[in-house]
Amino acid sequence: MRVVFFGTPEFAVPSFRALVGEGFDVAGVVTQPDKPQGRSRSRFEPPPVKLAAQAEGIPVFQPNRPTGAAFYRQIGELAPDVGVVAAYGHILKPELLAIPRRGMVNVHPSLLPALRGAAPVEWAILNGLETSGVTIMQMEEGLDSGPILHQIPERIPPDVTGGELSSYLAEIGAQALVEALALIEQGAIASKPQDHARATYAPKLTRELARIDWTKDAAALARTIRGLDPKPGAWTELQGREVKLFGATASDGQGAPGEVLTTEGRLLIAAGSGAVAVEEVQPAGKGRISAADWIRGRGVKAGQRLS
């Protein structure tokens, strides 16, 4: 089966490698342009999928947007049987979806119709779900609304971070993708329409959403901090200076929301109900450090308030 692969971040790499490893004919890879890095923006970092494709000698396409007659012609010339999309980062137009002979499938890290949208991994943790998984979906014009081809449910490990769950589901997604494509190739797969009435959504993570609201209960705050680790990072302010928090667990404690309860041996901060113990922090413009090092460096004291 001849495949054209659309993907960008680390999440997509296991699916790409599974296709190559299982002998699928990956004719081309479409990924986002290299991103400028550093203060001068003069250094460019290639997407992880680009590096993986180059290592296999597979042609790479990096349009600013996957639209236009010239781009559609390039994809058509690859003569794909199927298109595979895994965290590519752009919505694909019907003209593109129609090019592969058997359409396009998407590797989506949730059990659709739950958590349609851009950030299903993080929202699964933020919402306190106990189970998530991966769906292989036939793509159509709507937002993650196409028929379900294959699903693998997985229990969400306790205290997992967004980054850890993403890596875990990326491997599950690669397995699900290979299984689904094998069934498609055999003509043995049956699609199932989604129940749109049961759909929930996982919108893009905004800076404001990542700001910690200390009036919430400790369990919800710990989920927020874990779910947004490593990116974008849940943040708060101490004396007007931004700091991101990581490695949070709900704990006992009482005080005004955002109040530092103790700095002895650990950083414990009062929530609307209970308290949150924090292991690591990241001051603005710096790397992650232990909470203990930050406490010593900033002179953080019990009674101060985070906001």
Q: Where are the regions a protein language model picked out?
A:
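N-terminal Rossmann-like dinucleotide-binding module
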Residues: 1-40
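A short, local hydrophobic-aromatic micro-motif
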Residues: 27, 146-149, 246, 279
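N-terminal beta-loop-helix "entrance" segment that forms/cooperates
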Residues: 35-54
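A residue-level signal for conserved active-site and pocket-lining positions in enzyme catalytic cores
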Residues: 7, 29, 53, 83, ...
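Donor/substrate-binding cores of folate-linked one-carbon enzymes
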Residues: 22-25, 82-201, 208
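An anion-binding loop in the catalytic cleft
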Residues: 209, 215-307
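Structural motif corresponding to alpha-helix initiation and N-cap regions
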Residues: 13, 46, 68-72, 118
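Internal alpha/beta domain cores that form substrate/cofactor-binding pockets in large enzymes
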Residues: 2-4, 25-29, 56-78, 83, ...
